[in-house]
Amino acid sequence: MGRRALLLLLLSFLAPWTTIALRPALRALGSLHLPTNPTSLPAVAKNYSVLYFQQKVDHFGFNTVKTFNQRYLVADKYWKKNGGSILFYTGNEGDIIWFCNNTGFMWDVAEELKAMLVFAEHRYYGESLPFGDNTFKDSRHLNFLTSEQALADFAELIKHLKRTIPGAENQPVIAIGGSYGGMLAAWFRMKYPHMVVGALAASAPIWQFEDLVPCGVFMKIVTTDFRKSGPHCSESIRRSWDAINRLSNTGSGLQWLTGALHLCSPLTSQDIQHLKDWISETWVNLAMVDYPYASNFLQPLPAWPIKVVCQYLKNPNVSDSLLLQNIFQALNVYYNYSGQVKCLNISETATSSLGTLGWSYQACTEVVMPFCTNGVDDMFEPHSWNLKELSDDCFQQWGVRPRPSWITTMYGGKNISSHTNIVFSNGELDPWSGGGVTKDITDTLVAVTISEGAHHLDLRTKNALDPTSVLLARSLEVRHMKNWIRDFYDSAGKQH
């Protein structure tokens, strides 16, 4: 695994379609959610209203009157003023319309919960840019990009909705989010318990900070996914790195690698680390999107894509050339399952510049997640967690240095037992589950485990191929939400 790129590519799952210039250790600090394609169509057409709310740029200072328009979406087809509820999606690091169209669970349960659906865009993403074209100009303009400010936006928006929508004032609100959005949903319930009666935090790695979990747990889970999906699959990948290193020592070897991997551009010796990072990122992405049915994010993928990949990686005890030819076949499943791609492009691609820049700044300030590999418990080249290296890159890119302890100071780390009404769901296939809450903390801080689930599978729309484990998870989640709604109305009745 790359010396400084490992940490960053682990988080680089925001749609790669625009190239931007970022320092090496910042490039892959993309995001926690799945790769997104702005041109991809949702599985089911969604009907919603697009609205805007004027937010303060700084909720915590009193010497500025600067405001910006936060975008949010509302769908009220099934909402009932009597006995209804509001499901509030705490927006992630990206365009809110994509999250709206790809969080089918909320749409599926809206009628049952008599719910209005609200999807709130996170500041500094999508159209919710506090300083317009100057939003990413420098660290002074980015200074208000924090989870705390985003949570305050959500609180102000909920107050606005309850003030302005007849019938909404006395209804319970439930926060829902996935990945970073799931972290925000949990933190919102912790920090603003009077605003939401509960939270569903799907695939939310709230403990992937400091030393709360081992730094190698993420890549260990990725490796387990491949090991369980085919005999000798992970071992083939583990041996591929040395094969690449040996073949790249000569000009003829580089030429052979370029052809064998069907790359769009000739490899040079300076490209090898990037090549290995790109391959590693592919295996990580596959672990996140290992869904039980065909899906389409960056490109079409088959059902259970890791099993398909592992069909080509059954024998690690072959020559370097044959092993890497097999690696190409495996990569081709991810990058060219449709058969439309003529060559594989390892040149740097990331999300739209604004989205990637926003998240790389967050990863340089408060969202500091340690990652490492050792090549023994995982199938990657050894890489140690190096905070100083990250800090130096962040300072050169943004003029800021990370505060690795701030998230645990703000939100409590593992000391959260005083909070209530949060469901933490995690898929066992999802590498982010290593930093998630996977065991009940109290009777009201509940963990739901999905044995056949990848990254927030439970938030996706229902599918005929959904495994029993995700059906049970969704059923449990709805049951908890119904209990929160019932308790809210019971309490309101007693007060009158």
UniProtKB/Swiss-Prot annotation:
InterPro entries: AB_hydrolase_fold, Peptidase_S28, Ser_carbopepase_S28_SKS. Pfam families: Peptidase_S28. Residues 1-21 form the signal peptide. It catalyses: Cleavage of a -Pro-|-Xaa bond to release a C-terminal amino acid. Glycans are attached at residues 47, 101, 317, 336, 345, 415. GO terms for molecular function: dipeptidyl-peptidase activity; serine-type carboxypeptidase activity. GO terms for biological process: angiogenesis involved in wound healing; negative regulation of systemic arterial blood pressure; proteolysis; regulation of blood vessel endothelial cell migration. Keywords: Carboxypeptidase, Disulfide bond, Glycoprotein, Hydrolase, Lysosome, Protease, Signal, Zymogen. One of its GO terms (cellular component) is lysosome. The active site is at 179 (charge relay system), 430 (charge relay system), 455 (charge relay system). Residues 22-45 form a propeptide. Coiled coil: none annotated. It is found in: Lysosome. Disulfide bonds join 215-372, 233-310, 264-343, 364-394. Its EC number is 3.4.16.2. PANTHER family: LYSOSOMAL PRO-X CARBOXYPEPTIDASE, PROTEASE S28 PRO-X CARBOXYPEPTIDASE-RELATED. Belongs to the peptidase S28 family. Homodimer. This is Lysosomal Pro-X carboxypeptidase. The lineage of its organism: Eukaryota, Metazoa, Chordata, Craniata, Vertebrata.
